[in-house]
Amino acid sequence: MPWTLQPKWLAGKGLPLLGAILLRKTEKSEPQWKHRRQETHPYYDLQVKVLRARNIQHTDKLSKADCYVRLWLPTASVSPSQTRTVVNSSDPEWNETFPYQIHGAVKNVLELALYDEDVLDSDNVFSILFDTSTLQLGQPCTKNFTRQQDPKELEVEFTLEKSQTPASEVVTNGVLVAHPCLRIQGTVTGDKTASLGELGSRQIQLAVPGAYEKPQPLQPTSEPGLPVNFTFHVNPVLSPKLHIKLQEQLQVFHSGPSDELEAQTSKMDKASILLSSLPLNEELTKLVDLEEGQQVSLRMKADMSSSGDLDLRLGFDLCDGEQEFLDKRKQVASKALQRVMGLSEALHCDQVPVVAVLGSGGGTRAMTSLYGSLAGLQELGLLDAVTYLSGVSGSSWCISTLYRDPSWSQKALQGPIKYASERVCSSKIGMLSPKQFEYYSREKRAWESRGHSMSFTDLWGLIIEYFLNQEENPAKLSDQQETVSQGQNPYPIYASINVHKNISGDDFAEWCEFTPYEVGFPKYGAYVPTELFGSEFFMGRLLHFWPEPRICYLQGMWGSAFAASLYEIFLKLGGLSLSFLDWHRGSVSVTDDWPKLRKQDPTRLPTRLFTPMSSFSQAVLDIFTSRITCAQTFNFTRGLCMYKDYTARKDFVVSEDAWHSHNYGYPDACPNQLTPMKDFLSLVDGGFAINSPFPLVLQPQRAVDLIVSFDYSLEGPFEVLQVTEKYCRDRGIPFPRIEVDPKDSEDPRECYLFAEAEDPCSPIVLHFPLVNRTFRTHLAPGVERQTAEEKAFGDFIINGPDTAYGMMDFTYEPKEFDRLVTLSRYNVLNNKETIRHALQLALDRRRQAGGRVGG
């Protein structure tokens, strides 16, 4: 646990969770830690000697280049280094050596960038990503980096030796690495010459580059002579230094149309202390000499957290809460299946198929339809047979509203449906009332009081709160633990994706799951307790607790369709691919025989040479690929590193193309660009990647046998399945082939079954497109409509431009709401036998496999 916990965290839910965490540490055999292990790895001394470059042309072609090389190894240093600038030369030589100490547990990728210096701005000629794990100990290696049919080249010499620094212990799950965290605490006082309060306009600033904390300007205390405290947390592997700066605040007068005083900072002097030189757990005092005979006294103490002292979970198995839920839910599902399938006796727990129900995105249309689909499953007695219930965007609004009731699935759904109808069918003008605006302002001030700024996504969450409740909703996601504690309801999984700047969700998206117990990334095997989502973590340790956000803010994030870029808007709404943008992207060359080398050593990364885009091209890309808005959340993986062999881990689920992609800046093969290197998460609507949360239920640990997919979108009836099939094929995930007759794409049926008879690990998929087919003529399964009123009720358009159920339609007439709920319910009831057949297939697979399959 962190060294200091906030008092609010210790109250309420914090204390039970604290006890649970302490208990976990005493149970070494606990299954949820089976993928986390402690390892000891050595340090290595790496010497990088930048020799020379050849055939470098100046960008303006009127003079020769002024070249320098920038080196950046973020796993071993806190900031980039660079050579001197060699002016007016097409063939510059440097012969400069840069030493690094690298840790053997992490993937150390060196970035080398050749620049042509300009008066206004330096031009990046090309950049290189070099995996240092390819080097042999004690054997100097000279690399000539170039690309085919390009005369430009850079020559660099590498030497790798064992270090005299003792090996250190880390914690890893095979994808991420957590180092011990170094904490520096201390006080600063003026010494013999002056106290801090006597520095006048001068100010002392402390900074540790690479630390979690920002530079800290020290303000005198209210009582003269009292010391000023400081704290820094940093990775000791980076050889960090404490910088003490004496600065002066100057008031500069500007003459002109508006004569104003402007504060400017002038650096007067600077001193540094190497933090690795400090003894651990010992208090010591250092006198630092600054300008004009000033001395500052620093009383400091350094301590190191143990490598295993983490406040997040590193592992690829299911958390305790979900495991306990499954044990109880299987008993409920066994009895339900016995009733529905007419079995002579209840199933053994290992024979109970795992059924997941998925709801697609689609705004109010999806939310309303899911109520009807769940009502149909409940009427068939199948809701108790469902293990997981997951949704994207609008479907998540339905699910999260249902889970306000701890026993919602044990009651008739007419009550929740009526509640939803009253809100969907009412006027939304109240969200613009003075009272509501005062509420928005109050929430905004509350955010700002905690040091946050409210984003448009957060404001959207408050609007969704009004839309769903028309009053303040105090509920939090962790409250839903009560709804699954006895296995009484399906386990809810809410979906979002983490995106990176200037990359579409189609090209790169990291699925993030939200459950009552945990929030985390299956890709990294990194999870935090739901109560701690939004708090500040560094190197796996909780540094600052913030209260868990109310669920309305999560609902805004899960349904943040407006966070699209122009590129995604054209792609999703118009079906247009802006291929001309490819001309404005930089190019990538893999400079070694990558396919052959990957077979020999799957842990190594290819050497990549990037030719960056021009400033104009960057501006064009920014216009089309920057997101209109995107909420940012504290990154709980910040400060963790990628494991040395992460590329060979099956748990790190990425496309095989990622390792040899020529897509500029594709992050998975560039560990320095991956999420643990970021300060914040950018979480948006999962529909930007796949408009249904298939990736979250396809994890092998969940061993899902049958997926019941409800697609409420306005996209093609099989598009979400086809996108999922490609996603799975690219990543080696078992999934059935989606083969449909072209006629079905034009005029789809109500239900389709997809299964791979030869692959029992592939889930059975039962897919329900949202169509008005037999419902138009039938009041109920097998009962035709008779009266004009009955026929009129069933005669409506569900898809196309003339539908009343568009993505931007948030208010329905009562008749429109009833039609959509009734249609969705009917489509389930009318396919009772197909559902039973799918369940029978899942049961047969379980029996043939002797229990668990898919895992």
From Swiss-Prot:
Major subcellular site: cytoplasm
Residue positions binding Ca(2+) 1: D60, D66, D116, D118
Tissue: Strongly expressed in thyroid, expressed at intermediate level in stomach and at very low level in large intestine and prostate.
Reaction equations catalysed: a 1,2-diacyl-sn-glycero-3-phosphocholine + H2O = a 1-acyl-sn-glycero-3-phosphocholine + a fatty acid + H(+); a 1-O-alkyl-2-acyl-sn-glycero-3-phosphocholine + H2O = a 1-O-alkyl-sn-glycero-3-phosphocholine + a fatty acid + H(+); 1-hexadecanoyl-2-(9Z-octadecenoyl)-sn-glycero-3-phosphocholine + H2O = 2-(9Z-octadecenoyl)-sn-glycero-3-phosphocholine + hexadecanoate + H(+); 1-hexadecanoyl-2-(9Z,12Z-octadecadienoyl)-sn-glycero-3-phosphocholine + H2O = (9Z,12Z)-octadecadienoate + 1-hexadecanoyl-sn-glycero-3-phosphocholine + H(+)
Gene Ontology molecular function: calcium ion binding; calcium-dependent phospholipase A2 activity; lysophospholipase activity; phospholipase A2 activity
Cofactor(s) listed in the protein's UniProt record: Ca(2+)
UniProt GO BP: arachidonate secretion; cellular response to antibiotic; fatty acid transport; phospholipid catabolic process; prostaglandin biosynthetic process
Active site: S393 (nucleophile), D685 (proton acceptor)
InterPro entries from the UniProt entry: Acyl_Trfase/lysoPLipase (IPR016035), C2_cPLA2 (IPR041847), C2_dom (IPR000008), C2_domain_sf (IPR035892), cPLA2_C2 (IPR040723), LysoPLipase_cat_dom (IPR002642)
Locations listed in the record: Cytoplasm, Cytosol; Cell membrane; Mitochondrion
Activity control, per UniProt: Stimulated by cytosolic Ca(2+).
Transmembrane segments: none
GO cellular component terms listed in the entry, alphabetical order: cytoplasm; cytosol; mitochondrion; ruffle membrane; vesicle
Binding site for Ca(2+) 2: D60, D116, D118, D123
Domain notes: The N-terminal C2 domain associates with lipid membranes upon calcium binding. It modulates enzyme activity by presenting the active site to its substrate in response to elevations of cytosolic Ca(2+).
UniProt-recorded name of the protein: Cytosolic phospholipase A2 zeta
This protein's encoding gene: Pla2g4f
